[in-house]
Amino acid sequence: MAAYLLAVAILFCIQGWPSGTVQGEVRPFMEVYQRSVCQPRETLVSILEEYPDKISKIFRPSCVAVLRCGGCCSDESLTCTSVGERTVELQVMQVTPKTLSSKIKVMKFREHTACECRPRSGSRVNIGKHKRSPEEGEREPSSPLTPGSL
């Protein structure tokens, strides 16, 4: 077993880590950015959270992988929101503890097909110019980010 683990470790060193980059290699900005934007991405969802009325059953697996919106938006007042959905049907094993019976069951899950950054519920987003009262005064323009300012 130890020889197997050593061989796997050596293979990772030669071929690179599973993420696609060699350990210690810097991932390019555009790859980092593209992977972080608001988009449908594989997410593990608990079956019992999707079907709370089935609490008396046991499911295997207990969670399933579906596409759900996730990622970063350009502004704190925005959140990554689904704007398109479809229904997918997945096979899972349902176990009934009382009778110790099990069967393969097809269950439906929502999967997101398109995402957008939209205002958070309850957030006040100003569209256009906001007129300030004399008590508020003028606001100083924010300074742009420079490479050394972070």
From Swiss-Prot:
It is found in: Secreted. Disulfide bonds join 38-80, 69-115, 73-117. The keyword NAD does not apply. Coiled coil: none annotated. Keywords: Disulfide bond, Growth factor, Pyrrolidone carboxylic acid, Secreted, Signal, Toxin. Expressed by the venom gland. Residues 1-24 form the signal peptide. Residues 119-150 are annotated as: Disordered. Pfam families: PDGF. SMART domains: PDGF. InterPro entries: Cystine-knot_cytokine, PD_growth_factor_CS, PDGF/VEGF_dom, PDGF/VEGF_growth_factor. SUPFAM superfamilies: Cystine-knot cytokines. The keyword Cell division does not apply. One of its GO terms (molecular function) is chemoattractant activity. Residues 122-150 form a propeptide. Homodimer; disulfide-linked. Interacts with high affinity with VEGF receptor-2 (KDR), and with a lower affinity with VEGF receptor-1 (FLT1). Does not bind VEGF receptor-3 (FLT4) and neuropilin-1 (NRP1). Snake venom VEGFs that may contribute to venom dispersion and prey subjugation by inducing vascular permeability and hypotension. This protein induces an increase in capillary permeability after intradermal injection, as well as a drastic hypotensive effect after intravenous injection. The hypotension is mediated by nitric oxide (NO), which is produced by VEGF-activated endothelium NO synthase. Also induces angiogenesis in vitro, probably through VEGF receptor (KDR/VEGFR-2) signaling. Belongs to the PDGF/VEGF growth factor family. Snake venom VEGF subfamily. This is Snake venom vascular endothelial growth factor toxin barietin. It comes from Bitis arietans.
